[in-house]
From Swiss-Prot:
The lineage of its organism: Bacteria, Pseudomonadati, Pseudomonadota, Gammaproteobacteria, Lysobacterales. It comes from the Bacteria. This is Biosynthetic peptidoglycan transglycosylase. It is an enzyme of class 2 (transferase). One of its GO terms (biological process) is cell wall organization. GO terms for cellular component: peptidoglycan-based cell wall; plasma membrane. Its EC number is 2.4.99.28. Its main location: membrane. GO terms for molecular function: pentosyltransferase activity; peptidoglycan glycosyltransferase activity. It is found in: Cell inner membrane. The gene is mtgA. InterPro entries: Glyco_trans_51, Lysozyme-like_dom_sf, PBP_transglycosylase, Pep_trsgly. It is a single-pass membrane protein. Keywords: Cell inner membrane, Cell membrane, Cell shape, Cell wall biogenesis/degradation, Glycosyltransferase, Membrane, Peptidoglycan synthesis, Transferase, Transmembrane, Transmembrane helix.
Length: 245
């Protein structure tokens, strides 16, 4: 009996050391796995994103078992040139210049929110891609930290055009309508390559709340925002403002 107790005491330190090694190795393993994940999606088009999975789970949780979403991938050069510049004009005008985070926009949003106005975000297109492709919905500090991590990796390993291509294919433009191709087909019965400048601006205009606003039958807010986006796109210089392939 005494020998058994002694053996247990001797076995405890190695077990603790193994646990400690795993605890120390876990962040490195996660970092390596996430880098491989981002590198993989640099060249492979994802059939579904984490946000789409979340939308399915949300619908099923509400008892809507018949819910289906619409999404079809389109390469960047198969999308009307008016859509990328419209999205950049609406969502992230510093996109070609920043490295994932628009510090000036963050500061403006912080000042605006501190004054007690309607809460304003400052997420760049790169941050939105990180959130939509890799993460879940939520506002926890853990998710925010992971969003920042994936944003850094995306900016490090993907060219700007790939980031924008990914965004145009996973962004939600209507309830269950993801990506430019599905939006063009569902709303106007055409291919994404045939979107007009006005249609492109309308799609960009609904991005703040795509389940609330309608690009096909725009209300007053979407109409005003559409005109503003078109003016901004012209002032930026049109499609030539964006990085070349």
């Amino acid at each position: 009996m005494g020998t058994d107790v002694w053996d247990d005491k001797q076995a405890a330190p190695p077990r603790r050391r193994r646990c400690l090694r795993w605890v120390l190795a876990a962040p490195l393993l996660f970092a390596a796995a996430s880098v491989l994940q981002v590198l993989f999606l640099r060249v492979v088009d994802p059939p579904i994103s984490s946000m789409m999975v979340g939308r399915y789970l949300e619908a099923w949780g509400e008892g809507d078992w018949s819910f289906s979403l619409h999404q079809r991938w389109r390469d960047y050069d198969k999308i009307a040139a008016s859509l990328p510049i419209s999205v950049v004009a609406a969502e992230d005008q510093q996109f070609p210049m920043h490295h994932g985070f628009d510090l000036q926009a963050i500061e403006k949003a912080r000042d605006h929110n501190a004054r007690g106005g309607r809460v304003r975000g400052a997420s760049t297109i790169s941050q939105q891609v990180a959130k939509n492709v890799f993460l879940w919905q939520g506002r926890s500090w853990v998710r925010k930290g992971l969003e920042a991590w994936y944003t850094v990796l995306i900016e490090l390993f993907w060219p700007k055009q790939r980031i924008l291509e990914m965004y145009l294919n996973v962004a939600e433009f209507g309830d269950g309508v993801y990506g430019a191709q599905a939006a063009a087909q569902q709303f106007w019965g055409k291919d994404a390559a045939g979107l007009s400048p006005t249609e492109s601006a309308r799609l960009a205009a609904v991005l703040p709340s795509p389940r609330h606003y309608d690009a096909r039958s725009p209300g007053a807010f979407v109409q005003r925002r559409t005109m503003w986006i078109q003016r901004q796109a012209r002032q930026l210089g049109g499609p030539a403002y964006l990085p070349a392939p």
